Each structure stands twice: as C-alpha cells, then as structure tokens.
Amino acid sequence: MTQLAIGEATPHGATYDGHGVNFTLFSAHAERVELCVFDSRGNERRYDLPGRRGDVWHGYLAGARPGLRYGYRVHGPWQPVQGHRFNPAKLLLDPYARRVEGELKDHPLLHGGHDEPDYRDNAAVAPKSVVISDHYDWEDDAAPRTPWGKTVIYEAHVKGLTYLHPELPQEIRGTYKALGHPVMVAYFKQLGITALELLPVAQFASEPRLQRMGLTNYWGYNPMAMFALHPAWASSPEMALDEFRDAVKALHRAGIEVILDIVLNHSAELDLDGPTFSLRGIDNRSYYWIRDDGDYHNWTGCGNTLNLSHPGVVEYACECLRYWVETCHVDGFRFDLASVMGRTPTFRQDAPLFAAIKACPVLSTVKLIAEPWDIGEGGYQVGNFPPPFAEWNDHFRDAARRFWLPRNLTTGEFACRFAASSDVFKRNGRAPGASVNLLTAHDGFTLRDCVCFNQKHNEANGEENRDGTNSNYSDNNGKEGLGGPLDLMERRRDSIHALLATLLLSQGTPMLLAGDEHGHSQHGNNNAYCQDNALTWLDWQQANRGLTTFTAALIRLRQQIPALTGNSWWEEGDGNVRWLNKNAQPLSADEWQNGPKLMQILLSDRFLIAINATLEVTDIVLPEGEWRAVPPFAGEDNPVITAVWQGPAHGLCVFQRG
C-alpha cells in the first residue's frame, strides 16, 4: 500500500473499484481527518485524507481490497457548549460502513469525555468498519409493487419469527436465510400477507444499562451502523448481505414485498454519558440537534436526536434509504419516531428530508410508512405527513379495542375508524391506504394478551414495571392471566375473532403482528424490547392452528371485496358502503352517538358485516335478500338466511348476498 491519492468526493463511504478503495467522510467542522487501517494483528497505520470538497474529506488507497478494516480519527475543536466534541484519541466508525467488525461493548475507553475530553485511546476495543464488495447476481428479480389497496402487512422480528420453527433446518432458524426458506414462503402465501415488515435489520447495539443488567436490546431500535446488516442473524458476518438478499429474492418470487423498519431519529451514542464511536466524534454539531448549553435535544427518549434538517444529514439519510432499495431491493420503509424527520425544529410538511424524498425517483416510488410521533413538544403528528407517506393509525388501534373489549366508544367513532379515518387522512390528495390500521405491534400487548391481561407485567425488564404504556384498552374477561374456565376462554376467543375481523375487513392498510394469528402471548409484558428469549420467540408447536386458519380466511375474504381493495374514499351513494342498524335501516343520528353497539356494514352491496358488540345475544334483521355466511364464519351446515341472524354477545358475522 502507498500513501493516499486525493481520490474523489463521491460516492460516499468506502468504495472498492478493483484496484483500490476510495474513502470519503462528511464533516463540516473538522480541521483534519485521519484514515486508520488495521492489519490482521491489529496493527494500525494512519493516513491523512488529502482531499476536501465542500464538507467532504476524501482520499484513495491504492491496493486496498475488500476485507480491509478501517476507522477514522477526526481532529477539531473541543468546545462542548458550541456542540463540538472532536477527540482524535477515539477511533470512529464510518457512518456509511457496509460491514462492522466487533460489538459496542460497555467499556470506559469508548467514552469520549463529558466536560473534558477523554484522551485514552480506544482502538483496541472500538468496533471497526470493513470494506466490502457488494456485487450480487439478482437474476430476474422484480419488485412485486403490490397496490396499497391490496396490501396486507405482517410485522415480524427476524430472529423471533423462525427461531423455534421445527420444520426449518436447525442451523438457519432465527436467521435471514430462514425468511426465504420454502417453509416460510409457503406459510406467508397460505396466510395471505403481501408484505413482510421486519423490525430493524441495520446493525444495532445493546445500551450499556442493559449490558450491565445482563440483558440485550432485542428489537434493534438502537442503531450503530445504518448501512450494515446486523451480523448475528447470518451464518457468518461476511455472509449477512448476500443471505439477506437471497431472502428478498425468494420473497419477491412469491410476490411478497419486504419493508424495513428503520431508525433515522437517533443513534446508539445516546446522551453525553454514552459511547463516542461515530457521529459525535465526526461532527457532533451537524449530526445532532444541540441545545444552547451544548447538550442534546432528546425528542426520542434515547438521549439524542438526529438533525434531519441539516443538508449533510439529509444526504446521509437519503443515501442510506437508497442503499437499501438499490443494493438490497427492499420495497419500502417504516420509520421509527418519524416526526423527527419533519423537525426544523418544529414539524413541517415541507421539511428538507420530506422534500428530498419526494424529489428522489427511487425513494418516492417505494412504500413509506411513518410512526407519526416523537416525544418532543409538537411531536404527535398523526395525519399530518405529506404524500407519499402512509402512517400508523393509533386512532384505529384504540377505537377497535375500546369498541370490543368493552369500553365506552360510540358507533360513529367506530365507523369513522373503520372507514380509514377519513377525518384524519382525507387531505393533501391522500388515499385510504395512507391509514395503516393495526390492533397490535411489537410495542405493546400481543392480541392474546389484550384479552387476558388488564395490567402490564414488565418486571422481567428490570425497571420495576415502570416501563411500557398504561393505556392498553384491554380486558382480561374477569381473570388476570392466560388460563381460566371454558366460558371465559370462549369469550376471549370471540373477542379475538371480532378484533381480527375488524382489522382485516376495514378500509385502509391492515398490519398484522406476527404471532397474533397463533395466539402468541408475552405473558402481559407490553414492552419486551430486551427479552431475547421464549417470551418473544414464536412457539410454532403451540400455535393455535384454528386461529391461523381463521386469519387466513379473513385475508382471502378481504381481497374479494372491491370496497376494500379499490383504495378510494367511500362517498355516500357510491355503492361502496351502507351503515345500517339492527333492523337493517339507516343509522339515525341518535344511534350514531348514543345507540347500542349493534350495527351492520354493507360493503360493495353484497358483503354484509353484522356486529353485536353488546354483552347480550341479540337478533339482527338482515337486509332484504338471501344471505349466506362466508368463511371463516360459515360452518359445515351453512343455510341461507333471509330474515334474522341471532347475534351472540361479542359476535360478528360476514354474509354474502346470494
């Protein structure tokens, strides 16, 4: 290897061209940048990056090849109040690193200093960036591009989904390989989902607090390297990228999209007492929102907040997203705490990152789903994201639970949420698919726990049950816990069926939490972010097969109803929907607001959803015509009904006109 040539300012990161590697690093406030490369024995050699174009430092190392381990030492002022925390004693990860060797351990050498710099060198324990070649044969891969109106999302954790699956080869359980295995692909197809939404797969770290407690960050919302796949779910770290792409390719062949949950709102550097391993040491002032006293704005609850209005950070975020689309062929993203994306620092629909995504021909055409809040002032922004974003609809989640479990909710409020929350999303040219309807997600109770627990039980998380929400809108049906007498178990089953039908037969984009179709329980833990164990892993051998069949039949039924798949707003008289009372008459104003929870929803003039959310068996008069119950509500003896359905308590049935 020779001294660095000046190289080029683009592309960003470390790029192998067959003869050497071009290195770039963005830092608006650095005074000097050293590239540090390591041999197999850990010996370090340093090179100054000789080029600078604007705020991008660059250099070219001839003869360097994939597999080279490297990092940066960045020189500049230590002025904490001004937000500058440069410390060349700390080896730093490339923010664009495609692979990382080593974990982020709770080690004193990884701290850069609080009021004063920590000048102890950390190279011996710091994680290191690794140069890769990302060549891959995609063969004839093509994105499914499922229309929003036909999309059914399945939210899952890479490890937890398959780790206990008995039909998968032992060595691939809980890995990227398992996602594309024929056993899993066949299951997804049988269930009927069209998109697999994965909890974070970018490399993440366990917070020092968890490490000291003997726990790990299981969910992955603590990002360490946004361009690198988490290596623990691959057969070996160097195979992670190809194994993930193999899975994407297999899923695409089956017509299933892959959506990534991505964390652009904060980094694993946490607060000022957290480790300095990348952005803080590269350009703290540019990458993070800094308060007047030099500390961080903590709008994420994780200690820091990325400044996604800074031009350099906007470019970083967009290149990260494009990398996953162009190099890994993913079909979209779910953005964690997405209100941070629109902060300037107040939330704006024309914020720089939103504008950049909208203008990008790659990113503007994939599925974009916002978790439309953060914990800062003005952070709750449900309904306010610009096209082409869809959003998680917590109004739907809470209304569905309150309607069935049972809570005080009017028929009018339920109908509004059933109709894609038009009062929230029917603006700026958005379609009903912008409302991502959910009953549950990774964060909160599972569906089974919603009918078995009134209180959270998070003691295993080590925070004395203080963590996790207290607003669960759940109902244990008279007994806290999973067991109980037969009549109680039947009530719970009926509530689960009614909730699933509400989710999968409502207008908008449904999202199903993996395991809800099995009856998976986390034993009342509604914040299992640090539980990498049997509490969160899906137990396929104990799965409720009847519930899985019921769920699959609901999804098939959904795809047959034009009013649900058309992705256009329902208008009075358009034949898409009619709202009827228990006597098959239009609901009166009083019934909308004060009536019992009895109603009928006629979709596409031939599919009738009859609802009895009361505690009593009630006769419901069907509209004129011959009606027959449809799967999964049809039994072996499925007579034509022409007059009255005897609706059981907490009951729901779907009929099709003969």
UniProtKB/Swiss-Prot annotation:
Site (Transition state stabilizer) location in chain: 443
Ranges where the record places region Disordered: 459-486
GO-annotated molecular function: glycogen debranching enzyme activity; hydrolase activity, hydrolyzing O-glycosyl compounds
Pfam families reported in the protein's UniProt record: CBM_48, GlgX_C
EC number: 3.2.1.196
Pathway where it operates: Glycan degradation; glycogen degradation
Catalyzed chemical reaction(s): Hydrolysis of (1->6)-alpha-D-glucosidic linkages to branches with degrees of polymerization of three or four glucose residues in limit dextrin
InterPro entries to which the protein is assigned, alphabetical: GlgX_C (IPR040784), GlgX_Isoamylase_N_E_set (IPR044505), Glyco_hydro_13_cat_dom (IPR006047), Glyco_hydro_13_N (IPR004193), Glyco_hydro_b (IPR013780), Glycogen_debranch_bac (IPR022844), Glycogen_debranch_GlgX (IPR011837), Glycoside_hydrolase_SF (IPR017853)
Active site: 336, 371
One GO biological process term: glycogen catabolic process
Keyword Hydrolase included in the entry's annotation: yes
Superkingdom of source: Bacteria
Keyword list, A-Z: Carbohydrate metabolism, Glycogen metabolism, Glycosidase, Hydrolase
Known function: Removes maltotriose and maltotetraose chains that are attached by 1,6-alpha-linkage to the limit dextrin main chain, generating a debranched limit dextrin.
Annotated HAMAP family: GlgX
Protein family: Belongs to the glycosyl hydrolase 13 family.
Full protein name: Glycogen debranching enzyme
Organism: Salmonella gallinarum (strain 287/91 / NCTC 13346)
